Amino acid sequence: FLGGLQDHVDGGFARYCVDENWSVPHFEKMLYDNAGLLSLAARTSVLAAEFARKSEGEIAQRAQNLAWLAQRSAQGIIDFLNEELLTASSAAPAFAASLDADSSRDGRQIEGAYYTFSREQIALVTDPLIQRLPKGLLRFAPVAEDPQNFCFSLLRVPETNEIGVLHELRDAMRTLRRSRIMPVRDEKVIAGWNGLAIEALSEAALLLDQPEALALAEKAATSVWTMQWDENAGRLARVSFANRAEHGNEGTLQDYAALALGFLALGQASGHKQWAERASRLLGRAADFVDPETGVPRDAVQADARIAAQRSNIAAVTVLDDALPASGALYAKALAMHALQSMAAGDYTEADAADLESARVLSAHALALASDAPTQVATALEVQCIVSSPVQYLALSQWDSAEAKRVRSVALSLGLNVRHDPSLPGAAQTVQIQPCREELCQMPVAGMDGLFSLFASGKGA
């Protein structure tokens, strides 16, 4: 959150850093990277803040700093998605795929030209603030492949009284950037990548109380559904470009699963049932991607003969996370989250139970690979936690009290669904929390302290 991977001026994150100090990035910004980091930052902000409440001294301060940094990074990603990746279409604005690393300077294409600053430009933005700029806070790291230019980041967490001048500096740097030629944007609207962003924005809207994030998620979701879903065929186009969907290029399993997850999260955040209904339709088609004989998910319903031959006629999707979550694991997660939402709503059916079992089977490889390659099975591990946890959702006696909102935020950060049940017994002044798994519920516990005690006992883990 401090280093050069993050764009501290306009928000958002680059793909990776090119130096051992994490001070200079490869400047390309991808939609899916920022979607994943938005979810991580929003959850980290909530959980770190709760940890700070329960801690003292230096540990509490470090947790509080992490919560602040994570919230700042999440807001930066929201701003980046809205200001730099949202397409200009008035009819169907959605998220473009990426921003290039290169842009023009003095007639030449240079990596990072839009983002970096020369010594003269650094002096231009810092000199008016020089008396108030704190020492040991700012870092201008030299860019090896672009001599005499520097990348801005932070060396430490700013003190409360330093934030104002830091914002002034950022505004000055932003104004300077606006005089430059922007990097080229890849205008393709990819269904699955937008689904990941919609899911992350919906989570952030709830966790950080960010209505603008929810509005942005709804805008993109409406556009992708309107533009890329073929109502007559019941098919999803993988890509649209300039308000035209390529309906001859059906989405992959990854597109169906990721967009379904986005719609499920959006329905939960907005309270609008249409999104869960649309997610169900996407999952209905996604089921056709599972080989009926082997039960193995495939990239496409009909295997490409050339690809199948290279794979010994097995057209399975990858089971390992890479730059993107594994398609099979995303599908398993979508099935599990759909089932959990049904549980919390009191509508759990045999079909939901079957979907939950399918999710368990599709993610079972994570248990064998976790010790050797945890990052490559992270999505599948998340699914295993969902399906095996003794607590899958919570019922709350209160909904809008300050403590109830805290419980809801912590629950969502941990992947738990929540429902309102005012009939729960207990003291009226304290929120009562009932942990449940499928259709079986435990005795309620009182307040946030009771919930943490439950988790500490292992009964909620």
What is each of the regions a protein language model found here?
Residues 1-461:
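Glycan-recognition and catalytic cores of secretory/periplasmic carbohydrate-active enzymes
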